[in-house]
A protein has these predicted regions:
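A glycine/proline-hinged amphipathic helix-loop "lid/cap" segment
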Residues: 1-44, 194, 281
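Conserved catalytic-core motifs of eukaryotic protein kinase domains, centered on the activation segment
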Residues: 61-63, 92-93, 161, 226
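Short beta-strand element of the alpha/beta-hydrolase
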Residues: 46-55
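Alpha/beta-hydrolase active-site loop signature
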Residues: 56, 85-89, 155, 250
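Catalytic nucleophile-loop/oxyanion-hole region of alpha/beta-hydrolase
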Residues: 62, 68-69, 81-115, 259-262
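Short beta-strand immediately N-terminal to the catalytic nucleophile in serine-hydrolase-like folds
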Residues: 118-120, 151
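Gly/Ala-rich beta-loop-alpha elbow adjacent to hydrolase catalytic centers
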Residues: 120, 124, 128
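Alpha/beta hydrolase fold serine-hydrolase catalytic domain that processes acyl esters and thioesters
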Residues: 1-6, 47, 113, 130-281
């Protein structure tokens, strides 16, 4: 509770930055009472990305992350939607899933499903991947997006093997303590025992009809412990996927290009996204 109260105070101080770029129409809309930032190219494009910024389900997107979203939009040529989804400081995780689904549905009025990608970092990676089991969970009137990229997707530990791997990686990880992934389940439930299992242990989700998916992990992060379980899930459901691992790299390294290898991760992320949207580099 002390952790959550600390995050509530930090989130209360957080502000949506005032972005300016002559190539974009930048605006906001509201979905379920939450702001969604729209970064729309003035030169019309039919390609878009739903950009889900992580924060352990308890921290709102920081101004620096929003500026990275604009850089991503600029470098990929995609229109980008950034939802400030409900956090588990105040709601169970079901609320975030519902709001993100509603945001995606709103995008379908402007873009074809196959022209929409979903990129998520950390807990945002969980939410990006989680759109698939959510659609399969009685929302099958919604078409799947065209492509998913999950960077260091967060999920809770489901097996002893995952926990053993995570404890080993904990010795190297500078960002996500293994112990947090033990306590995260209660944070995500927020007192609601009806939160579906797949929202907490995403590796158990139903990935039927999942679009092509790219995973990107750093080899030295605790969340990499769950990569084999995600691979097994992808194989079980016949998903076209790729697993990219940055050797010696840290949590969400492509979006924190603080060294040469991490900068290469950012460039790779941009190249892959453009390729999947059929945009020439």
């Amino acid at each position: 509770e002390e952790l959550l109260e600390n995050r509530r105070r930090q989130n209360a101080k957080n502000r949506i930055p005032d972005l300016k770029d002559d190539a974009f129409d930048i605006s906001r809309m509201e979905i379920m009472g939450c702001p969604v930032l729209k970064l729309i190219h003035k030169k019309r494009t039919e390609q878009a990305d739903l950009f889900l910024i992580g924060g352990g389900m308890i921290s709102a997107p920081r101004p620096g992350s929003i500026k990275k979203a604009l850089q991503f939009a600029r470098e990929t040529g995609l229109d980008v939607y950034v939802p400030y989804y409900p956090l588990c400081t105040g709601y169970p995780l079901t609320r975030a899933y519902e709001m993100i689904h509603a945001t995606y549905r709103s995008m379908l009025f402007e873009y074809k499903a196959e022209n929409i990608s979903v990129l998520g970092t950390s807990s945002g990676g969980n939410l990006a991947l989680g759109m698939v089991p959510y659609i399969n969970d009685n929302h099958d009137d919604t078409p799947m997006p065209g492509y998913i990229m999950a960077i260091s997707p967060g999920t809770c530990v489901a097996t002893d093997a995952e926990w053993q791997r995570m404890q080993e990686l904990d010795k190297k990880d500078v960002a996500i303590p293994a112990q947090y992934m033990k306590t995260a389940a209660e944070i995500m439930r927020h007192g609601d025992d009806s939160v579906p299992e797949y929202m907490i242990w995403l590796q158990k989700g139903d990935f039927t009809n999942c679009p092509k998916t790219t995973f990107i992990y750093g080899s030295d992060e605790t969340l990499y412990a769950c990569a084999p379980s995600f691979e097994a899930a992808m194989q079980k459901y016949g998903v076209d996927y790729e697993m990219i691992v940055g050797e010696g790299m840290f949590h969400c390294y492509p979006v924190f290009p603080v060294c040469k290898e991490a900068k290469e991760g950012w460039d790779l992320m941009i190249r892959l996204m453009k390729k999947e949207h059929g945009i020439k580099s």
